[in-house]
Amino acid sequence: MRTRFAILAAALFASAAGAASPTYSVSDFTRVRKFDAHVHANMDVLSFLTVAKNDGFELLSINVDYPDFPDLKTQADVTQKLQAADPKRFHFATTFSMQGFGAPGWTERTNAAIDAAIAEGALAVKVWKNIGMVAKNSSGHLIFLDDPGFDDVMAHIQSKHLPLIAHQAEPKNCWLPLEQMTTENDRSYFKDHPEYHMFLHPDQPSYESLIAARNRFVARHRGLQVVGAHLGSLEWSVDELAKYLDTYPNATVDLAARMTQVQYQSVRDYAKVQAFFVKYQDRILYGSDLTQNPPSASERAQNPPITGAEFPAEADKFWRSDWAYLATNKSQRVDAISADVPGLALPRSVIDKIYYANARRVFFNGR
């Protein structure tokens, strides 16, 4: 019953909004220029670039110090080859290793590695959730993002006019038992990644403490543009996201791998979610988290990578589904939340920012 009312309300709301603000259609998908600001292209093949070209996307492939991915050098080599193949369409973000953090020379080595990546074309630097959840200092204590040991590196990144992409904490579902999680994609991920399922590790940092450390970091580095990967791990509440964006003018967020959490909310309060996207249209970047990784029997990536001949079709399907939700009023079944989800039908001017202009502003600094 709730879904039926949501669909009716969405149709009425979209109709009223559409009278004043033109929207895109499903058929507009390939002709509108777009930028996926969060992918992982870890294979030296051209299929990702091919489907991106066909669908009208530029890509930002993000290197991550993630044990399920190839090592950092291999990731860097692949992204540089793909950038050379299509420099106008393919871009990349670098990262750094936490190995040796706090020891003499770590800051200098890290800054030198960042400079080398910039020389190769890096547009941003990524920090991952191992900061705060895995990496420890020489005393055996977890290292949080607001640790002063990062300050000189962050100042260096800021001096180079690069943004920092920060994946901190996890979806709030991570601190719930599996049966209480709101989306099936979170449930399956944490079932397969028990080491990151914080409900099973009450001795580990709380969700609130990780978010607080991230917020202190963003406040301390006001001159650094901080892109909150995965909706800044505030995916569960557009109200909390609004508070975060209001408090920190240097913050933006990407949508990567969190669309179902947004859809979970829009099924319950369509008008609120639509209004959030309109109000914060300059602060939200489209990202998918699509991952093309070498096949591995032990692979357990958050978005299971799609390899081989099926990748272009699956990527195209994923992108079109997101487009239908954000840009049109089309309703589609979303199994991850067991609901029929009407599209938000955001105005064209809003879509153009979320899908392209914001990424160009943040990552190219006006270039």
Can you say where each PLM-predicted feature lies in the sequence?
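Hydrophobic faces of well-ordered beta-strands that scaffold small-molecule active sites
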Residues: 35-39, 59-62, 90-95, 125-127, ...
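Acidic-and-aromatic substrate-binding clefts and catalytic sites of carbohydrate-active enzymes
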Residues: 38-46, 65-75, 99-108, 135, ...
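An N-terminally biased module of ancient metal coordination in phosphate/nucleic-acid-related enzymes
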Residues: 19-89, 108-109
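Bacterial N-terminal signal peptides
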Residues: 6-16
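Active-site gating/metal-coordination segments in enzymes
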Residues: 22-27, 77-203, 252, 259
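H/E-rich (His + Asp/Glu) clusters that bind or coordinate divalent metals
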Residues: 202, 206-216, 225-367
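Helix C-cap/helix->beta junction micro-motif
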Residues: 86, 159-160, 221-222, 247-248, ...
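Positively charged n-region of N-terminal signal peptides that target proteins for export
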Residues: 1-4
